[in-house]
């Protein structure tokens, strides 16, 4: 296992990190696994999106050396002295962040680097990160991004085929668009001492991803948990050689709620640090998001109002991490969403 070259001290100005009791791995809720080379893959993907909003993919086609190299480069960055890392922050939203998650008071036992995944829309903070890191860091990010994007396109095109969405690239073209608002996030969760009464620190609090799809890969340290239909939390066994796919809020809307955006969180491990890398596939800011007419022909049957990605992104940025953000865009907002998750 790759480890950080030196202990990491997070921002000491923030001391109140939320805690939870650990949850067991619930074997009754086996995480769906999809072999992308399987002729039945598209059927399995849709079933997983309907039942969990989450699944693991194997035989994904991303070269293992790219995954390992980007992890090593991330470890190198997070192992830098704090003063050097701070030059890449604070995030706006791109750049380096430490404990603070967003602008509305959410905190976690985490440091992270958020990079714009679209070279056509390079941000000043992303450029600053590349200036302060070796050339191999940028090369690793760019090569990894090329291959992970192909995974996301393939998954979305399989979804379209299985649901009968025409044309086949209806979903994937939003991510292929030169103005796609996608990003890559590198997370580092340092090992954290166990709190009193066996409580553990929250690395990243419960939330859903607002984009269309998220593709996650981590090292072999546990911590990721998802919320299943009965409201219980399930610990996801780590697998450094595979990817985990999350349904995002935008895809939930486009399928009119048939797919569910999965609520998830990360708890800090008390023994080992965790490195994760997530590609968030988002559409262009001007893209209209609404139930797809080929799936829901009558607008009276739509559960959601039409909105642009820019509108939703702006709304999400003003909310707390755990807020039910889609509630503002439902045609008949739920009075008590907590009873339904």
Curated annotation (Swiss-Prot):
Enzyme active site: 274
Cofactor binding notes: Binds 1 Fe(2+) ion per subunit.
InterPro entries, per the entry: DIOX_N (IPR026992), IPNS-like_FE2OG_OXY (IPR044861), IPNS-like_sf (IPR027443), Iron_ascorbate_oxido_reductase (IPR050231), Oxoglu/Fe-dep_dioxygenase_dom (IPR005123)
Alphabetical keyword list: Dioxygenase, Iron, Metal-binding, Oxidoreductase
Cofactor(s), by name: Fe(2+)
EC class name: oxidoreductase
Reactions this protein catalyses: gibberellin A1 + 2-oxoglutarate + O2 = gibberellin A8 + succinate + CO2
Protein name according to UniProt: Gibberellin 2-beta-dioxygenase 2
């Amino acid at each position: 296992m790759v480890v950080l070259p030196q202990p990491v001290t997070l921002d000491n100005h923030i001391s109140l990190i939320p805690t939870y009791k650990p949850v067991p791995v619930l074997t009754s809720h086996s995480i769906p696994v999809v072999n992308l080379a399987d002729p039945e893959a598209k059927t399995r993907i849709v079933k997983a999106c309907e039942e969990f909003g989450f699944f693991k993919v194997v035989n994904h086609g991303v070269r293992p050396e790219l995954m390992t190299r980007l992890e090593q480069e991330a470890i190198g960055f997070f192992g830098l002295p704090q003063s050097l890392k701070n030059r890449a922050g604070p995030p706006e939203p791109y750049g380096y962040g430490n404990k603070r998650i967003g602008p509305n008071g959410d905190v976690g036992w985490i440091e992270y680097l958020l990079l714009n995944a679209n070279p056509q829309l390079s941000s000043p903070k992303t450029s600053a990160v590349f200036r302060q890191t070796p050339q191999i860091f940028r090369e690793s990010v760019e090569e990894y991004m090329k291959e992970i994007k192909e995974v996301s396109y393939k998954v979305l095109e399989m979804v379209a085929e299985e649901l009968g969405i025409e044309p086949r690239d209806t979903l994937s073209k939003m991510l292929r668009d030169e103005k796609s608002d996608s990003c890559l996030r590198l997370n580092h969760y340092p090992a954290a001492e166990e709190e009193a009464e066996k409580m553990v620190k929250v690395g990243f609090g419960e939330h859903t991803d607002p984009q269309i799809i998220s593709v996650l890969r981590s090292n072999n340290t546990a911590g990721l948990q998802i919320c299943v239909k009965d409201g219980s939390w399930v610990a996801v066994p780590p697998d450094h050689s595979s990817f985990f796919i999350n349904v995002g809020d935008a895809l939930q809307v486009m399928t009119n709620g048939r797919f569910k955006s999965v609520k998830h969180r990360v708890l800090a491990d008390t023994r080992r640090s965790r490195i994760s890398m997530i590609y968030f596939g988002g559409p262009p800011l001007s893209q209209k998001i609404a139930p797809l007419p080929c799936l829901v022909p009558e607008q009276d049957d739509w559960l959601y109002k039409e909105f642009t990605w820019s509108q939703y992104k702006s709304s999400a940025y003003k909310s707390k991490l755990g807020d039910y953000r889609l509630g503002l865009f439902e045609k008949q907002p739920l009075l008590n969403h907590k009873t339904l998750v």
